[in-house]
Curated annotation (Swiss-Prot):
A GO CC term assigned to this protein in UniProt: cytosolic large ribosomal subunit
Organism for this UniProt entry: Paramagnetospirillum magneticum (strain ATCC 700264 / AMB-1) (Magnetospirillum magneticum)
Subunit structure: Part of the 50S ribosomal subunit.
Described function: Binds 23S rRNA and is also seen to make contacts with the A and possibly P site tRNAs.
UniProt KW Ribonucleoprotein keyword: yes
InterPro entries, per database record: Ribosomal_uL16, Ribosomal_uL16_bact-type, Ribosomal_uL16_CS, Ribosomal_uL16_dom, Ribosomal_uL16_sf
Similarity section: Belongs to the universal ribosomal protein uL16 family.
Listed PANTHER family: 50S/60S RIBOSOMAL PROTEIN L16, LARGE RIBOSOMAL SUBUNIT PROTEIN UL16M
Annotated protein name in UniProt: Large ribosomal subunit protein uL16
Length: 138
């Protein structure tokens, strides 16, 4: 799964995802893409599950680009622990995704295969998404 090799700080504030994405809203690598329509934190496990669903449907043809990276640590306290005594240990990594962000891109496959593959990948993600292509948003 994806995670940073090293970070400046071990723990991070929760924060909020406001407005639409600043960058990463256009296709840069592939012919087809999956665009986020809602703000959400997406975990490294969800990214990996979506990637697996997509690559298995494509039968390892073509190329897949993951355009988001989980660089935000999410901490949690163990079960049945009293409040206080500091912030919990980092449990998993997430990526902050704003509306309009491209999540995945593919190239080298037919549009129908890409469209169905993205539908399978989108089922693994906690947000609404949209299929886009270089020809025009469909």
């Amino acid at each position: 799964m994806l995670s940073p090799k090293r970070t400046k700080f071990r723990k991070a504030h929760k924060g909020r995802i406001k407005g639409v994405t600043k960058g990463g809203s256009a296709l840069n690598f592939g012919a087809y893409g999956l665009k986020a329509l809602e703000p959400e934190r997406i975990t490294a496990r969800q990214i990996e599950a979506a990637r697996r669903a997509l690559t298995r449907h494509m039968k390892r043809q073509g190329r897949v680009w993951i355009r988001i990276f989980p660089d935000l640590p999410v901490s949690s306290k163990p079960a049945e622990v009293r409040m206080g005594s500091g912030k919990g240990a980092p449990e998993f990594w997430t990526a902050r995704v704003a509306p309009g962000r491209i999540l995945f891109e593919v190239d080298g496959v037919a549009e129908e295969i890409a469209r169905h593959g993205f539908a399978l990948a989108a089922a693994k993600l906690p947000i609404k998404t949209k299929f886009i292509s270089r020809i025009g948003d469909i």
